[in-house]
Structures are given as C-alpha cells and as structure tokens.
C-alpha cells in the first residue's frame, strides 16, 4: 500500500551502538506497537561485515516471520556486504545503498554502477519480497559537495541527479536524509525544511517512491520542532514515508530524527 493516496508509511530504525540483537529486537517490538515499520525495518549497522549483517537480518526476520508481518527487512551496510550475506543464505529483503549524483561521488562511497546492477540481479533471485522492486536508496543534499564531487554544480542540482540514477533501478523506496549533512551545507531549520520540500518535489517528479528522513545534527541551528514541522508539511504534500526512531534520538548515528 505504500505510495497510494492517503497512506503515510514509516521506516522503523532500531539502531544500537553495539549491534546488540536483544536491543534491536526490543526496539522493533516497540516500533511495531506504534504501527511503525510498514515501509521497511532497517538497521544501520556499526560493524560492516557479513557475519554481523546476517545476525541482524536473522533478528529482523525472526520478528517478521513470527508474526507474519507484511513488511521487509534491511541492514544498511555497504551493498557488496549485503550481496555476499544474501548469497550465503541470509534472509534478503531490500538491498540498500547510499548514492551520489556524480561518478566521483559514488566512488567516494565505494560504489560503482556495476555493483548496483549486481544488487538488482541478486535481489530478483534471492530476496523474500512480493514484488520486483528490491532496492532501497538514500540521498541528501550536500554529499557531493562535501566530497568535492560536484564539479561546480549546486547541491540541489546534484541531488536531482541522484533521483535520475535511482529511477533507472526502479527501487522500492528512496529517501533523502535531509539534515544529516550538518550546518556546513544546511545551516538551520528553515534551510532544512526548504531542502526537504525540494527533495520531495524532485523525487515525485522523477516518479520514484519518495520518502524523507526529517532530521538534524546536534550542532545545527535547529530543534525537534523542525522535524515535526517538516513531517507535517511532507505528509500534506503526499510524502510516502518518514523514519521512526525511539524518542526521535538515534543513539548510533548521533542525530535527531522523528
């Protein structure tokens, strides 16, 4: 049902500073009790290796399978780690990767297009999802500039290029992590709100299933009112999904969210 009129979904984000599976499971249960997690249950891992990723995926799908929950899991490690884990038998849901609007920017993330091609092929063969859309991308204004990979273009133009790349792979979901770049590129709450609405608009124009991580870093000129205001604006504008984090405070990524 994600993306249909009147549906506002959420990614459940049960991160833990130690990748402790008991903590992750407890956060999953809490989030589900609020109806959060219909877009994806996605963990940002501390340790990016196949064994840890498989352990966390097993935890996520242990809950999904026990209660027959109509959602999908994801561990947001590097795309190559996810591919290897799934090929070794880990339960596959969505395959994730952060993307950038230039080849140089992708290389800064350690990514080549061939990896995304392989991820789509592996997802089509192994992933436990109902449809064909098996990829999950994250973006955000300023990433290309911070990597010196914008070639003189402004951050909105570079962000628009992200959505063109994402559309090529027909992903299940895409979201901007709008304030995570910090005040060096989006200084305060007004700039973050503007960027969130810009990204939503560009994503929708690109025809992709667009969401937004309404967030800010602790050194930005912003507070939790920003996240709530942007969340309401995006819901009114038809955004597909946002994030769900315990108390809006991600203890692993060290930023403030919804």
Residue ranges and their predicted role:
Residues 1-25, 33, 38-258:
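Anaerobic metallocofactor- and corrinoid-dependent redox/one-carbon enzyme cores
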């Amino acid at each position: 049902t994600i993306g249909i009129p009147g549906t506002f979904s959420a990614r459940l984000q049960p991160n833990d500073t130690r990748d402790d599976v008991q903590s992750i499971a407890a956060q999953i249960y809490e989030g589900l009790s609020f109806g959060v997690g219909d877009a994806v249950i996605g963990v940002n891992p501390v340790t990016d290796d196949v064994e840890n990723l498989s352990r966390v995926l097993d935890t996520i799908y242990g809950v999904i399978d026990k209660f027959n929950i109509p959602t999908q899991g994801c561990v947001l490690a590097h795309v190559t780690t996810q591919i290897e884990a799934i090929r070794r038998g880990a339960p596959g849901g969505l395959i994730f990767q952060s993307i950038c609007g230039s080849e140089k920017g992708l290389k800064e993330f350690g990514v080549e297009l061939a990896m995304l091609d392989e991820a789509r092929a592996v997802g089509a063969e192994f992933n436990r999802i109902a449809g064909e859309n098996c990829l999950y991308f994250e973006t955000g204004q300023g990433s290309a500039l911070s990597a010196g990979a914008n070639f003189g273009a402004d951050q909105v133009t570079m962000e628009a290029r992200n959505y063109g790349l994402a559309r090529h792979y027909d992903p299940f979901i895409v979201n901007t992590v709008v304030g995570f770049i910090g005040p060096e590129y989006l200084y305060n709450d007004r700039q973050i709100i503007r960027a969130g609405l810009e990204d939503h608009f560009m994503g929708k124009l690109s025809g992709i299933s667009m969401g937004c991580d309404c967030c800010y870093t602790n050194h930005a000129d912003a507070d939790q009112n920003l996240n709530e205001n942007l969340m309401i604006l995006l819901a009114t504008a038809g955004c597909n999904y946002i994030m769900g984090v315990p108390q809006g405070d991600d203890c692993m990524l060290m930023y403030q969210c919804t």
